[in-house]
């Protein structure tokens, strides 16, 4: 049985959407790791005396920063990462919903072919 061109096109779109879903999932996992690292760094920073020397990594350099500024920077970074994760989670949800819809449509089209 040969698959009609329109169904083949839907299958190609479905595969592209699957790849997009995988990419979004990987990005979410990456952000989750960054969130964990930032939370750990912030916890360690909060355990540190406010008068202690604090350094921030900038590329290959460590730069001395003010303790309060370091805490503020880490909190901002953490907030940004959490917002990014929420945005990506919504994107993942939309992609997964679209995948389910496409799968249903493709299955219905294939069953229609078998009924012919």
From Swiss-Prot:
Q: Is Chaperone a UniProt keyword of this protein?
A: yes
Any idea which GO molecular function terms this record carries?
Answer: protein-folding chaperone binding; unfolded protein binding
- Note the coiled coil stretches, chain numbering: none
- A Pfam family of the record is Prefoldin_2
Against InterPro entries, the record matches this protein to:
PFD_beta-like (IPR002777), PfdB (IPR012713), Prefoldin (IPR009053)
Q: Which Gene3D superfamilies match?
A: 1.10.287.370
- Is Cell membrane one of the keywords UniProt gives this record? no
GO cellular component labels: cytoplasm; prefoldin complex
Q: What is the annotated localization of this protein?
A: Cytoplasm
Provide the GO biological process annotations. Answer: chaperone-mediated protein complex assembly; protein folding
Keyword line: Chaperone, Cytoplasm
Entries under SUPFAM superfamilies matching the protein: Prefoldin (SSF46579)
Describe its function: Molecular chaperone capable of stabilizing a range of proteins. Seems to fulfill an ATP-independent, HSP70-like function in archaeal de novo protein folding.
Quaternary structure, from the entry: Heterohexamer of two alpha and four beta subunits.
Q: Which family does it belong to?
A: Belongs to the prefoldin subunit beta family.
What is this protein identified as? Prefoldin subunit beta
Q: Which gene encodes it?
A: pfdB
